[in-house]
């Protein structure tokens, strides 16, 4: 299985630096690639990528701004792998992440999966509070944190896996935002693909929203 990590970014070089630092410490030793899609940024991350050129297999693409869903599709079209893993740029990836994903897919293969998110001790108080609110069953129902308490699991694109076949058949994310994540899940189900949660495939999600924006959700 050849993984391609798909990471759209918009004006977030500092986040990309933290994300790539975590990927440089991966315990996974098979070949994989990282595809960075710069979505029309005015503050580019190219200098950050140069720091990791001798440590990571990175492909970089700059394109006009068209939003996160279209940028993920662009990255998957350019990628060489047969299984794509999509991250937000504000995620930090545990060293055993790809090992856990590979083991889970070997045991029970699906064409689309999602994983939970957690907060690191180093996150700010507001980031920890928002993370709790987004992942607690008492608030959002635990959907974004990976709860299996309701219906079919709908992966979220901050931490999502998608096979090349499922991408090619579904054409990936639709041209809607927000709402592209559940839209993709529903279309995959209609096409006969299955989705699942991989509890061990969690990421540390350093959410960059504030209380005012969070209250709207």
Show the residue positions of the predicted features.
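A conserved acidic beta->alpha catalytic loop
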Residues: 22, 38-47, 65-66, 88-94
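Cell-envelope/extracellular polymer assembly enzymes that use nucleotide-activated donors
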Residues: 2-4, 33, 183
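Short aromatic/hydrophobic "clamp" motif used to bind/position activated sugar donors
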Residues: 84
């Amino acid at each position: 299985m050849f993984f391609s990590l798909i990471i759209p970014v918009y004006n977030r070089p500092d986040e990309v630096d933290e994300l790539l630092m975590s990927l440089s410490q991966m315990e996974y030793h098979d070949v994989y690639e990282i595809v960075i899609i710069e979505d029309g940024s005015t503050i580019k991350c190219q200098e950050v990528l140069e720091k990791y050129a001798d440590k990571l297999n990175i492909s970089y693409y700059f394109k006009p701004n068209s939003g996160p869903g279209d940028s993920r599709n662009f990255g998957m079209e350019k990628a060489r792998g047969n299984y794509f893993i999509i991250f937000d740029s504000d995620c930090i990836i545990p060293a055993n992440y790809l090992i856990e994903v590979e083991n889970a897919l070997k045991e029970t293969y699906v064409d689309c999966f999602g994983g939970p998110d957690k907060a690191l001790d180093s996150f700010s108080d507001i980031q920890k509070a928002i993370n709790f609110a987004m992942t607690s069953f008492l608030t959002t129902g635990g959907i974004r944190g990976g709860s299996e308490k309701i219906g079919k699991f709908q992966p979220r694109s901050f931490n999502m896996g998608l096979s090349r076949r499922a991408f090619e058949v579904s054409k990936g994310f639709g041209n809607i935002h927000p709402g592209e994540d559940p839209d993709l899940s529903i279309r995959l189900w209609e096409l006969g693909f299955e989705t699942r949660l991989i509890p061990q495939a969690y990421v540390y999600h350093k959410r960059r929203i504030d209380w005012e924006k969070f209250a709207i959700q």
